[in-house]
């Protein structure tokens, strides 16, 4: 099971959360990754935690002011990146370019999608994984595996029909170990979450609870 904690732009301590993630990851067969703000990637990677970017741009070296260069992300210690999160939606052509940029830099890719149809389109771009996240459930604490389990199983089937090598994750409302187990039961091989850890009073305890049943 792959657990990706997106810190978004929350006012949290990314290094402390990364240290907790690295420690908890040693107690479980699950992989726990942390996606901090771009400026924090190096510090987070230095903790030994599996580190992802929140986005990379579909650009190469050159005159691209404001772009997040995949090579820079990799040089600072990230091993993967999110793409097309619901809060940072991109056009399909740009997602394709970002997947290519990430692959060029040796980064794993997780492309987010809102529904099974978008999952199929994302899978056709050849990422390492796609993640289905209904926007209405993001940050609610109500897990997608409980509120709309069919969207997870349908997303798994949609990706399988396009490219069986693409992993399927689910997100939105994931906060407990039970949520993670339910996602796996529906066919997902990973989960995305944010506020359940980034806004927790005790992020280490929240992480431990997430992976305890695994």
Swiss-Prot record:
Q: Where in or outside the cell is it found?
A: Cytoplasm
Q: Which family does it belong to?
A: Belongs to the triosephosphate isomerase family.
Please report any disulfide bonds recorded for this protein chain, giving both cysteine positions. none
What is the documented function of this protein?
Involved in the gluconeogenesis. Catalyzes stereospecifically the conversion of dihydroxyacetone phosphate (DHAP) to D-glyceraldehyde-3-phosphate (G3P).
Q: Which GO terms describe its molecular function?
A: triose-phosphate isomerase activity
**Does the record carry Cytoplasm as a key word?**
yes
Which reactions does this protein catalyse? D-glyceraldehyde 3-phosphate = dihydroxyacetone phosphate
Q: Please give the name of this protein.
A: Triosephosphate isomerase
Keyword terms:
Cytoplasm, Gluconeogenesis, Glycolysis, Isomerase
Q: What class of enzyme is it?
A: isomerase
Classification via Pfam families: TIM (PF00121)
Lineage of origin = Archaea, Methanobacteriati, Methanobacteriota, Stenosarchaea group, Halobacteria
Q: What is its main location?
A: cytoplasm
Q: Which CDD domains match?
A: TIM
Pathway given in the UniProt record: Carbohydrate biosynthesis; gluconeogenesis; Carbohydrate degradation; glycolysis; D-glyceraldehyde 3-phosphate from glycerone phosphate: step 1/1
Catalytic residues, per the record, are 85 (electrophile), 133 (proton acceptor)
One Gene Ontology cellular component annotation held by this UniProt entry: cytosol
Protein source organism: Halobacterium salinarum (strain ATCC 700922 / JCM 11081 / NRC-1) (Halobacterium halobium)
Which EC numbers does the record give?
5.3.1.1
Q: Output the InterPro entries linked to this UniProt entry.
A: Aldolase_TIM, TIM_sf, Triosephosphate_isomerase, Triosephosphate_isomerase_arc, Triosephosphate_isomerase_AS
Q: Coding gene?
A: tpiA
Query: Subunit structure of this entry?
Result: Homotetramer; dimer of dimers.
- A Gene Ontology biological process term: glyceraldehyde-3-phosphate biosynthetic process
Q: Does the keyword Isomerase apply?
A: yes
Q: So which domain of life are we looking at? A: Archaea
Tell me the residue numbers annotated for binding substrate: 6-8, 138, 173, 194-195
